[in-house]
Amino acid sequence: MFKTASGEEIFIIDGHVHNWNATKANQKNMHGEQFINCFYAYHSFLSPKDQLWTREKFDQYGGDQLYQDLFVDGPDDMAIFQPTYLKDFYVDGFNTTEQNAVLKAKHPNRFILNGAFDPRDGEAGLDALDELAATHKLKGVKLYTAEWKGDSRGYKLSDPWAERYLERAEKLGIKNIHVHKGPTILPLDRDAFDVADIDVAATNFQGLNFIVEHCGLPRLDDFCWIATQETNVYGGLAVALPFIQKQPKYFAHVISQLLMWLGPDKLLYGSDYGIWTPDWLVKAFMAFELPEDIAKETGAVLDLEAKKKILGLNAAKLYGIDIEAQKRLLAPEQAVPREPSSNVTLQQVAEAS
């Protein structure tokens, strides 16, 4: 829970977290090492100095550390697990639904557990999706269109098999389709993350919500032109948000474009933990104000009401979460109340970097 200087409580749903295993023992080949090296480079480049982790910790931090960083030291109230299997790179997978389910079982009121599918798995994959949905009562999935599988280096949501999987997801009540459409990660191919196929899928599947993780970066314009027309396309701010202290002008450009084209009702906060931790991200976001010239040019408004929507209300709507009821469920395990922190300035956050 984030509490403003005036005492107002803001319910926070972190829309993008992981609990991965990238240890040497789990790396199947050089590509597993390349992948986590790239993640660590993003972490090192955009994190404040006092938030930098050792490489050993970064490779596998574990569930206890995750809980501490999100809900005790951090302001998150709930978090959504977004799995990334990468079975061609990691022996037991990088960050799987099955791994995440262990922590979900331990803290059922804290986590939303999403699944995943890969249309290249054919009929067997459809059966597996049925089983996964039944076991975990899924409301969402995370897709990684650039994931390698054998000789294939990606797929598109407009592929015939992908459409069969989306049809099955809708039939199963899996309404929220999170898709990585953002920066590439070595060794994956940049163009396999192209955002264009979102346009086709969103048009063809009006009963589904497509949450474009990372807002299509570096293809921000392409994403905005699609999302402003497709009523069922949303933007996830993971990766975009950490630029807030390293390159605030760039972040101001990104968030103003998103607000101008999509509005505050279609944007979701995500820390992308464990690349970054939520405490400094939320503090910086709450302290951030759009530069006057950008606000005037775009007409974008990033006031407290907009921030509340982005930080939790929008995700709650997509996942059918009654926030007041959820607060009551969480009350027994709430940590010592956090001190009001909205008076933290961006300069103070930047000074730690």
Briefly describe each language-model feature range.
Residues 16-22, 180, 214:
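Histidine-centered divalent metal-coordination motifs
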Residues 19-20, 183, 217, 275:
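Short active-site segment of divalent metal-dependent hydrolases/proteases
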Residues 1-15, 21-70, 127-131, 261-266, ...:
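Mid-to-C-terminal alpha-helical segments outside catalytic/metal-binding sites
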Residues 16, 104, 113, 132, ...:
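Conserved, mostly hydrophobic/aromatic
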Residues 61-68, 96-101, 125-129, 195-198, ...:
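Alpha-helical scaffolding within the catalytic cores
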Residues 28, 139-140, 154-269, 294-301, ...:
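Catalytic pocket-lining loop regions of alpha/beta-barrel enzymes
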Residues 78-80, 85-192:
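Active-site gating/metal-coordination segments in enzymes
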Residues 23-29, 93-94, 126-128, 153-155, ...:
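Short aromatic-enriched loop/helix-cap "lid" or pocket-rim segments at secondary-structure transitions
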